[in-house]
Design a protein with these regions (language model features):
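Metallo-beta-lactamase
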Residues: 4-7, 101-209
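Active-site environment of divalent metal-dependent phosphoester hydrolases
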Residues: 19, 79-84, 107-109, 147-148, ...
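Conserved phosphate-coordination/catalytic loops
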Residues: 30, 52-56, 81, 200-207
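Active-site metal-binding motif and surrounding structural segment of the metallo-beta-lactamase
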Residues: 42, 53-100
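Glycine-rich, histidine-containing beta strand-loop boundary motifs that form or position
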Residues: 78, 101-105, 165-166
Length: 209
């Protein structure tokens, strides 16, 4: 379900409690969450999509949150399917939008979504580049090998919020972690297990962030 994170920022991701193994390797008895956000300003930026398994829920969350407005940007932090699964749908649904990704991420769009036409629709960003949405300004920081080579994170300088891709993730769905009811529940165990299995061997790169 959508949830307000900050004055102009809404969470529009989805929990997936039907999945038993993350990346077909790691048991996730509490499932996982696919995290996606919308920043509302003079221009609207959608931060990542979700896995196709949750397409219907994400589309509903997105369009309910937009209230008839059209997004200007889709910021793609990471090209794994749990972040990028609905890029092609988004590009077709919002033909005037621009897809923002790292220099290494842009070529992967056509590799992952060969039937989609991204020509004239992309913006490649590099370390320290910024994107103004109006009041909000995003700064992009490259995070290669956290844990794929094209990964980047973005920092909303106005809100003081970091959109961190996989760098600081955790296993488990958000409902069971108290995200929707503001309860403080244990994040540490599943956060540590996620870091050890997914990002641990790239610890130096994570710490550089």
């Amino acid at each position: 379900m959508p949830r307000t994170i900050d004055t102009d920022i809404r969470y529009i991701g989805a929990d997936d409690t039907s999945i038993a193994l993350f990346e077909n390797q790691y048991p996730v008895p509490q499932g996982i969450s696919y995290n996606s956000y919308v920043i509302f300003d003079e221009k609207i930026a959608v931060m990542d999509t979700v896995d196709g398994r949750k397409a219907a829920e994400w589309k509903k969350n997105l369009e309910e949150s937009l209230e008839g407005r059209a997004p200007d940007y889709l910021v793609v932090h990471h090209m794994e399917p749990d972040h990028s699964g609905l890029i092609a749908w988004f590009a077709e649904r919002y033909p005037d939008s621009t897809i923002v990704a790292s220099v290494k991420g842009i070529p992967m769009l056509s590799q992952f979504f060969g039937d989609a036409d991204f020509s004239g629709r992309t913006l490649a960003v590099k370390e320290g580049d910024t994107l103004s949405l109006g009041r909000h300004e995003l700064m992009f920081v490259m995070a290669p090998m956290v844990h794929w080579p094209e990964v980047m994170v973005s920092y909303d300088k106005t809100a003081g919020i970091l959109f961190s891709a996989d760098a600081f993730g955790k296993f488990g769905n958000l409902a069971d972690c108290g995200f929707y009811d503001d309860e403080d529940k244990d994040w540490e165990t599943e956060g540590a297990r996620y870091y050890f299995n997914i990002c641990g061997k790239y610890g130096v790169q994570v710490q550089m962030l």
